[in-house]
Amino acid sequence: MRGILLTGALFLQYYVSAAYIELLKEDTLNMVEQLVEFGKDEKDTSVWDELAEMTDLYGNRMTASVQYSRSAEWVMKNVKKYTGMTAWTEDVNVDYWKRNEESVHLYVPTRENQMVNLPMLGLGQSVGTGPEGIEANVIPVSSFDELQTLGNKTIAGNIVLYNADFVSYGENGQYRFNGAFNAEKYGAVGALVQSITGYSLMTPHTGTMNPAGIPAAAITVEDSKLITRMYNRHMKAKQNPDIENAELFVAPRVKLVMNAQNYVNHTQQPNIIIDIKGSEKPDEIVILSGHFDSWDVGVGAMDDGGGAFCSYGALKLISRLPRKPKRTIRVIMWNNEESLSRGADGYFAAHKNELDKHIFAMESDIGNFEPWGIELMSKNATLLNLYTVFGNQYLPTIGGGNVTLVDEPPNVDIDPLCAYGIPCGGFVTLDKYTFKNPSTPAGFEGYFRFHHTEADRMEVLDPHQLRRNAAAMAAWAFMIADQ
Ligand SMILES: *[C@@H]1O[C@H](CO)[C@@H](O)[C@H](O)[C@H]1NC(C)=O
Ligand SMILES: *[C@@H]1O[C@H](CO)[C@@H](O)[C@H](O)[C@H]1NC(C)=O
Ligand SMILES: *[C@@H]1O[C@H](CO)[C@@H](O)[C@H](O)[C@H]1NC(C)=O
Ligand SMILES: *[C@@H]1O[C@H](CO)[C@@H](O)[C@H](O)[C@H]1NC(C)=O
Ligand SMILES: [Zn+2]
């Protein structure tokens, strides 16, 4: 997940009592009921097991890396085990951003080791510092307004630290995306960003940033607060040199080294596409999707191995049914979601003559915990009412049947399709740890504890939740495709 989530989105909950309507024809309902039953089979841990095998073998799937290619080959080999599926790849040009050696050291002269090594992660797309690095004082700010108030006089020649506490990804993400660009305007030589999370165990969180001429990196919440306290004590001591320990309160000063390199259009790598062809209208398409690329830390189990493999798992469940859906159900594992959306843009361009044949596009890219439902973007009120009834009537036993209306594309990869006017949905789950309704602004706090960190490993995910997600997504796809 990269994009800003649902800021200012419109949340409408529709409760339609529809016990009296039999909306699905019996033949469709039978298939949907079987998919729901598959979701209850406690012995089936295949979605988790397969994702574990692939990620154990190849590690992360950073776009343009060799691991991305090997993982994609693993899927293309795996898909041969299933009958009734047609799989192919569609290449797109991708840039390769390599972080290489990087570090932040904080000068604390009272410690035995005066250069304290801080865990950090350079932000994707950042320029490097060169091997010599840069050394400068750090000026903490909690907002862009504060940056502007301090202005060139205070900022020029220094490194800006954005230390805002976690509110939501949308609110805090602006400092990661635009922090360096804005700081540069006031003559800053670098930017540090407090990692975007409400809960930290000294884990830095990376993520992409908008182009800027100065380097930028994420540090942990703990170190962001340490630097802020040092700065505040230093300012106090400057105003009043008589306070106790004033001479010990040095200005926070760091050495930032980033050998990051960006290789434009380094290689061509695929979106992975897998179809179960429809029996009556094979040219009409319902998409289930997640992105296949990940960051270069952890293994991208949660972001977005879970979304990609629950989509794929859904298709495998559908392949076990006694008959095919009327329309084609297409799984897409998108490339390059985490930085430049070349996968989404490439698909849109390559399929521009058949966009009108796309009936629905779903993506799962905000965690796969207990199924909750879909965030629907559609101007069609009939469709909203219909899906609300579908979800409530056919999915309550495994969850995933709630429907909420949003007025912005719910996920990055389906964004072009949603914007084109294809009804689309983000598949969302009850948040890990907080179990909050996902349509509240901070409803994804548990997800963001792991997002873009070394800790995004298989242990974040639960095999039974993944199976239920796959079954719920399969049921949605089948209901829509069989209409
Ligand atoms: C701030 O400093 C930058 C870099 O030194 C300079 O380009 C810019 O014009 C300055 N802006 C203001 C408002 O002084
Ligand atoms: C890289 O690829 C993109 C998209 O495929 C293209 O628009 C761009 O012109 C290419 N850039 C270079 C430097 O080749
Ligand atoms: C709205 O959705 C309904 C139900 O799927 C469909 O029958 C109808 O054609 C749609 N209307 C438009 C304008 O797309
Ligand atoms: C809707 O979400 C709630 C949890 O917020 C869950 O208990 C319920 O089963 C869901 N409903 C459906 C129809 O999936
Ligand atoms: Zn993602």
Language-model regions, residue ranges each:
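Noncatalytic luminal/extracellular "stalk/propeptide" segments of secretory-pathway proteins
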Residues: I21-L24, E33, K40, A52, ...
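N-terminal capping segment at the start of a domain
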Residues: L23-S65, H205-G207, D293-S294, F360, ...
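Second-shell loop/turn segments in exported
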Residues: M31-D41, D56-Q67, A136-V141, D165-A180, ...
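Extracellular/luminal Protease-associated
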Residues: S65, V116-A218, V299, V403
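Soluble metallo-hydrolase cores and metallopeptidase-like ectodomains found primarily
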Residues: L121, Q125-G151, T208-A301, R320
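Metal-dependent peptidase/peptidase-like ectodomains
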Residues: A216, S224-K225, Y231-N232, K281, ...
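Alpha-helical metal-binding/catalytic segments enriched in His/Glu/Asp
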Residues: I272, E284, L288-S341, M473
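His/Asp/Glu-rich mid-to-C-terminal helical/loop segments that flank catalytic regions of hydrolases
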Residues: R327, T434-Q483
